[in-house]
Amino acid sequence: MNPQIYSIAVANHAEERIYERYPNGENLNTDKLVQEAYAYGKSSFHVTRTSSVFLKDIETRYENGTALLYNRYIFIFSEENVFITMYKNETVII
């Protein structure tokens, strides 16, 4: 879904993960970070083949969501533009 038409929602679980895993997460503008990750994050089409397989595996674990690499983290979004969770990236190479 186009985020310019359908805004991106942030699940409570995802917001907690930002606070836990992102440096200085409690002082961030969560909505801005999520919008930037969605707009500028790298998908499985923009990374190396090995990393692409890893991102696609994550996507299948989240009911075919979208995994985007942004600022050394992997952000996972649902098909309905809901930010579900995030992981620190230690595997994916651009």
What label would you give each PLM region?
Residues 1-94:
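Ribonuclease/tRNase effector modules and their secretory precursors
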